[in-house]
Amino acid sequence: TMPIHLSVQANTVNAAAVKFWQERGLTRVILSRELSLEEIAEIRQQCPDMELEVFVHGALCIAYSGRCLLSGYFNHRDANQGACTNACRWNYQVHPARQDETGGFLLEEKLRPGEYLPIEEDEHGTYIMNSKDLRAVQHLAQLMAIGIDSFKIEGRTKSHYYVARTAQIYRQAIEAAWANKPFETHLLTELENLANRGYTEGFFRRHTHDHHQNYELRNTQLGRQQWVGEVMATVAEQSGWLTIEVKNHFAVGDQLELLRPQGNLKFQLTQMENTMGIPITVAPGSGHQVNIKTPVLETNVRFGLLVRTEG
């Protein structure tokens, strides 16, 4: 029998809902992002035999666990079918609702003048603004102690470099927690190096509204590391040389890091050639291939992601 998992879109926020789905044969529930650590612990206590999964990293919807209609309204692309256009992150102007006795506000999207959307605001902020990204790596040990079975990283529309780097960092935190080691704060810095919209702990703990929302910037903030290439193969009869498919600009003299499942390698690029064996100093545009000299000793490297770092 194929196991059935319940999507976060079902908005499971309490033990009664978990038991309801368990009685109908589901094997795992992905809990709503809006739950606190205490609420998650209570659900686990009341539902000891159900697999529970929680989101710990990635983009956050402004709507309740992704139940958003903005993308469908503006562009006829359903956010709940993987086609979200991130309408919540567009540039809006706020207008007083002069005809509204409640004293509310209207939003006007920059490219749709004259189309006004009513919004509501309370002590927690405006529900249509740009959310920061979730980052809960510092809470993994507590979530593991609670008894969560699986952690989920939101990676839709992200590159496989982003997913690989994020998963690698969270794996380090999981292994440290299993070994009863203290949380290593440098993992927070590693995640800062990735492109992000600013980070928040989400609803795991209670914060003021400005902790959750990014009111100043719509666009993703570029990190201090950039994915510049992907390993295609080792160069025959040339020890340490790898063929790289170029993704972004890099050059001789850059500080690089090679991400691999068996461990990362940091080095300064000293030699690069085109596919004809002619020395070059700057990688050509995206999609081209180059050969570079690395500290790799293996003779049959088939996978790796190349990252340019600062310093």
Regions found by a protein language model. Name each.
Residues 25-26:
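As written
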Residues 1-12, 16, 30-150, 157-234, ...:
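Active-site pocket-lining/capping segments in soluble small-molecule metabolic enzymes
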Residues 239-240:
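Basic, amphipathic alpha-helical/coil surface patches used to engage anionic, phosphate-bearing ligands
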